[in-house]
Amino acid sequence: MWSWRRAIGRILVRSSRTCLALGVLLVLAGCAGPVSEDARVRPGSFGPGSQEAAAADVAAYAFADAARTSGQPAAAARAVAAVEYLAARLHDRSRTTAVPAAAVPAGDRDDLLLARGRLRAALGIGATVASQTMLDGLLAAADDLAAGDQAGARAALPPPGFPPDIIERLGALPYIWQVNAAAKTIQDDLTRFGDAGR
């Protein structure tokens, strides 16, 4: 009688250990944040030439002064998309980009991820929204807003991924020093890389 009870006890202990190990792995996976993914844009989305360099120029200019996006949701949408694009493209070195890893120090890439998080928080956008979803929506909205099509812009940024007042939030972005600093640093990194290649 005791032998089968011991066998059942061993099975239960092993099952508990397995569940605990799985639980730890799930917690660690959650702490790591959303899985990074590829981020693609059409040529010329941020300007001519390399889209990484063009995006850095857009972001550095827009976020240096809140007045440059205040009341201008189209400009804000493109600038936020620029930060999103740079964070996704430069942080995951497994993807192919025109920019080698050595051109942008790891610390600068980490600061860019922090800046992306600050922007998402200011806009009421969750960390789980995919980078490609952000890019597609923001760039389409920027084009619609520039053409005066606010209804089209809202349709490009639908809930639940984006808050209902996303257009208003874009037009009232506060100055966020982490975003300004990260954008300027990345611009400097890419400028040095470009100069070195000439």
Each language-model region and where it sits:
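Bacterial signal peptide processing site
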Residues: 32-35
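Post-signal peptide N-terminal segment of mature Sec-exported envelope proteins
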Residues: 39-65
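Mature extracellular/secreted ectodomains of secretory-pathway proteins
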Residues: 60-198
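Secondary-structure junction/capping motif
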Residues: 19, 49-52, 165-166
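Bacterial N-terminal signal peptides that target proteins for export
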Residues: 2-20
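C-terminal motif of bacterial Sec signal peptides marking the signal peptidase cleavage site
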Residues: 27-30
